[in-house]
């Protein structure tokens, strides 16, 4: 770890710098170099680009704060949850910028606009979702490799969906959420260890770790309308995406609370359900968020997604572990996979009702199938690569433990008092 990780991290960053030198330039660089007198035109381009900055800022907060804190629910893995999240996102946004730009420019130099940066953040979200499936069972070296491989596959599938099939997926329920979840599940299946079949002693949350994770959920919940509307190409579509996501999220919260109480003993609420299933409405409405659907349609989608997510955590996650040998640490299948599929199906139905030409409906269905199939194949290949012992995967007894890869402060006496106080509150 001492040499493998620094060498790989520095090597990858050097590669990124070289690729940026070869392919990337500011939006105004070409305009001013061709004609120095075209400063007004260049300024207008930048002004238009900057209109997207509030959306970029919201998405950026989701990536680094939302997903980061959501991963801190394990009581001895908080440093890695939020820290490796930062590492993945920082490397991923650079590689996402390059690989997506190369696809769209067909190998030529390309200009950086705010939309490029939003799409780069989107590409990192796929890896962060997959990270949730293998949380606590992989090394930082493995996550660097997975970041590069997954974003490459994601960019190829995204190009297929949007530039060849011409499907609609504004909030990317299919291309980000379903893709990221099933990619992660495929990797988790390959990396499955029978030694972790019985629940690990570190695979637990405590009162304060769940509170930190809930903060992450709130960041994601608040900014999700921006996520689903950031790449819409018209103001009216952005407006529809914001409104539909807003109400879909609200509906999923109410349904998630109700189903959690229904399924838990004595009607109590389960914090795992609340942290995750309350976000399912934002995932599920993404594909058709900008389409001309009434708000109640978005609320129905959100309600279904919230219920399905809770039932998934209660019944499917244990089934996946015991029967399919897929250990999904964060339950990404329930927050991103199933709601992503629901979003894809909702998009197919909406397009079928709106369009008289069946070609568009077929394209939507093909996009959903492509996203899942590409994710599974890419995940299986990536998992096989990550399984090579050289990448410093932690042994079973050291899983879900920060001290393997981090300098962790020793617990002081006041820490014990703090934990005792929390336990009394709990």
From Swiss-Prot:
Glycosylated. InterPro entries: Ammonium/urea_transptr, NH4_transpt_AmtB-like_dom, RhesusRHD. It is a multi-pass membrane protein. Glycans are attached at residues 31, 37. The chain crosses the membrane at residues 5-25, 55-75, 79-99, 125-145, 146-166, 171-191, 211-231, 242-262, 271-288, 293-313, 332-352, 372-392. Residues 26-54, 100-124, 167-170, 232-241, 289-292, 353-371 are extracellular. It catalyses: methylamine(out) = methylamine(in); NH4(+)(in) = NH4(+)(out); CO2(out) = CO2(in). Gene3D superfamilies: Ammonium transporter AmtB like domains. Keywords: Ammonia transport, Glycoprotein, Membrane, Transmembrane, Transmembrane helix, Transport. Residues 1-4, 76-78, 192-210, 263-270, 314-331, 393-426 are cytoplasmic. Component of the ankyrin-1 complex, a multiprotein complex involved in the stability and shape of the erythrocyte membrane. Heterotrimer with RHCE (RHAG)2(RHCE), that transports ammonium and its related derivative methylammonium, in both neutral and ionic forms, across the erythrocyte membrane. The transport of NH4(+) is electrogenic and masks the NH3 transport. Also, may act as a CO2 channel. Moreover in erythrocyte, regulates RHD membrane expression and is associated with rhesus blood group antigen expression. This is Ammonium transporter Rh type A. It comes from Bos taurus.
